[in-house]
Amino acid sequence: IYTLSLHDALPIWISSIGYSLCNHFADADFSSSLPYIRRITEQVLEHGLPLGICLNVNFPDTASLKGVRICRQTNGAWINEWKRSLHPRGGEYFWLTGEFDNYEPEAEDSDHWALGHGYVAVTPTQIDVTAYGMMNELKNWNLEV
């Protein structure tokens, strides 16, 4: 799953919107994001989303938002990503704490580029991890018995 904010909606094919601010402190200021949250939500209600499509909307941690960019997810990987913790009421949980290794920092059509340049990043997501580019190559392999 690309984003934890959409983790619960995707497995049951609910169309949804996940909003996240690139600030994980309890006193994070969402005020500059609120007009965008309202507008994006209104547009989704007006136009609808196809079944299973989830909009992943991320806001940079700045009061001076430059606008909206429709993006694809950045190609990269998390490094040292999970911290194991014990819940005060029992049990354990894992917190995403690592660093994102961006394999394409200059890709202006990616969400990380948009966020790094002060834009709201809107990425339509879905569950389909098929490697379509590999399908034709596999058809040329001798896989039959």
List each language-model region with its residue ranges.
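Single conserved hydrophobic/aromatic residue that forms the stacking wall/gate
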Residues: 1-8
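Electrostatically charged, flexible surface regions
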Residues: 30-145
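Glycine-rich phosphate/pyrophosphate-binding loops
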Residues: 11-32
